[in-house]
Design a protein with these regions (language model features):
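TPR alpha-solenoid repeat register
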Residues: 30, 64, 98-101, 134-136
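"A position-specific structural signal for the A-helix of alpha-solenoid helical repeats
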Residues: 33, 67, 104, 137-140, ...
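TPR-repeat structural position
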Residues: 44, 78, 115-116
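Short coil turns that delineate tetratricopeptide repeat
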Residues: 59, 93-96, 129-130
């Protein structure tokens, strides 16, 4: 680990039995930077390997988890995308990172044709931190549902309040807020 908060988060989640030694060089960051470059070059398998190595060096690095999830998205490995996104959740502790988590979950549900959950996730994402990305996904869903309604495939478009979205999340085992352990450590 390379940051003092990461040290405490690591100790909390991984409960090491031995002394934790931190490398003098940010090796995990080097691997993550290489992985980011591989993604830009569309070398997703290489990126996957590099993100995994980054996580070996720093198993609480949120950016490496999110990057690895993106690799799985591009490789169309949606179950791994979901698994890694859920692993990343533990380390989300800001409004922006929680919004990213819900955008990832929204993408997963959209790719699974669960438009209700996708819409709830993207809406929840915007509650945490408003982004153009979430807006464009919500517009895409709205337009697709409107077109389906016009063709008689669906009946109506739904609006969700927070309580309804949280009930939907409970049903699908999507966390409705940040992990309390992480928040306790960071704040």
């Amino acid at each position: 680990t390379n940051h003092i908060m990461e040290y405490y988060i690591y100790a909390c989640y991984f409960e090491p039995q031995e002394e934790i030694l931190m490398p003098e060089l940010p090796i995990a960051e080097y691997y993550r930077t290489y992985a980011d470059l591989c993604v830009k070059l569309q070398k997703y398998k290489r990126a996957e390997d590099a993100y995994k190595k980054a996580l070996c060096w720093n198993p609480v690095d949120l950016d490496s988890y999110l990057g690895l999830a993106e690799c799985y998205k591009y490789l169309n490995m949606m179950s791994r995308y979901l698994d890694v996104t859920k692993q990343a959740y533990r380390f989300c502790c800001t409004r922006a990172t929680m919004a990213r988590y819900y955008r990832n979950m929204g993408f997963y549900y959209l790719s699974s044709y669960n438009t209700d959950m996708a819409k709830a996730c993207y809406t929840y994402s915007n509650i945490y931190y408003h982004t153009d990305n979430a807006d464009s996904e919500l517009n895409y869903i709205e337009n697709a549902l409107k077109e389906a309604k016009d063709k008689g495939v669906t009946k109506d478009d739904k609006e969700y309040d927070i309580r309804t979205m949280q009930a939907m999340f409970d049903k699908e085992n999507v966390e409705p807020g940040p992990d309390s352990k992480t928040i306790g450590i960071v704040y």
